[in-house]
Amino acid sequence: MKNYTELLKSELIMALGCTEPISIALAAAKAREVLGDIPTKIEVKCSGNIIKNVKGVTVPNTNGMKGVEAATAIGTVAGDSSLGLEVLSKVTDEDIKAAKCMLDNNIIKVSLKEGVENLDIEIVAEDDKENTVDVEIKNKHTNIVKVTKNDKVIHIDNCYTHTPEYENYDELSVKDIFEYANNVDLDEVRDLLEDQITLNSKISDEGLTGKWGVAMGKILMDEDDSIRSKAKARAAAGSDARMSGCSLPVVINAGSGNQGITCTMPLVVFANEKNYDRETLYRGLLITNLVALHIKRFIGRLSAFCGVTSAGVAAGAGICYMETKNLDLIEKTIGNALMIASGMICDGAKPSCAAKIATAVDAGISGYYLAKNNRNFEAGDGLLKDDIEETIRSIGYVAKEGMKETDIVVLHTMIEK
């Protein structure tokens, strides 16, 4: 149980803005800090999935700036690397002007880094005295694995350079997650879950009341007053705001704010609508967060497989837990939902992610409704196996290995002029 608690504490962290551009800003801020001055030349080398997820999303606190160059520029002039995923929380209007000036001067060059892990960012910054700093992030959004200045090593983390991103999560299983959620002392996780509920609800509120994205959440909320539609709307609304540059922080899951919101809001809606007590909501969130992490460890943090699918499926499992406390139904919910939603591709972070979240949450709820009515998909139907752990692994295998070429084609299609 201690390991599950530590896992949650390491994953459910606060982030301001979409995590891929924020990760670039973090690397850029670190490069400037080590260099000791504003660079006169910057080269940004990114894996394909980073480029894909930064291309169409608004960088927070920039008045609408988008793209790798924008994230690099604002991180360089205004970032504070000590703040991690809140690196851009102190941006001023003057900083935005300076970042735009940097973009106008065309000193930032972006290139695709091939043959690397899906989450790989390297920034090489040079000043007017030809001092050079190299900063590299790998595997997780805040993991700076290498810093050099004039080829002298300042920092290197060999462990994170070579360690698979989910190596320490091997003990995860749906059964053990269920036992943990049932029995853990809630005092160990109460503050963590309260932050998740409070922050993710706040950005969802903003998505429903402000002018963000295509207003997917608002539209769903206005169309239908059912609990199902409210769950979809509240999750989508948070993404409406986040993908369009809202600076409110969120609690993430598996490195993703959208996934953190998707894990949170459907359960908050069901708890409010059905008057569940706080303990029931907390334990349901433990199921959802850990199931999402469990599914994602086989898929990878970034891939061609849309990440909110796993979060929507996990939300269905959490709702099932709150309503039934039944392990068999939770396993069937996950299996059913994966058969409904698997296959949705990731074509980058952008406003339409809100609609994908609504689709994923709908699949999670459908999976649960099928399970509670004893109408389940059977083993042999597509990727569904006899055992839920085998099913999760089969989905992960298709997503991580089978969709590699899909990922390449999606990226090339997106960057075609």
Swiss-Prot record:
InterPro entries linked to this entry: Ser_deHydtase-like_asu (IPR005130), UPF0597 (IPR021144)
GO biological process: L-cysteine catabolic process to pyruvate
Taxonomy, superkingdom: Bacteria
Listed GO MF terms: L-cysteine desulfhydrase activity
Protein family: Belongs to the UPF0597 family.
UniProt name for this protein: UPF0597 protein FMG_0209
